[in-house]
Amino acid sequence: MTIEELEKVPFHFVAHMSMEDMHTTTYESDDGRFGFCDHVPFKNGEPHGRTFRHYRIGLKVYKSKAKFIEALKDV
């Protein structure tokens, strides 16, 4: 699969978890094959630090976009 093909896959909101030190929002493709989570660190009630994203194919989680893109070639 290519990035262009992935961009055509519809995603929907699944969950949002708000903790004192981190907010996490999770999205999943309509067919359940792909997902991603956006993580926002918080400190004293305000966003603090760098936001990051984890990617998922099936049950395998990728912490870098480069590794995720490499794994897409096998899908």
Tell where the protein language model's regions lie, with residue ranges.
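A short, charged, amphipathic alpha-helix used as a generic interaction element across diverse proteins
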Residues: 64-75
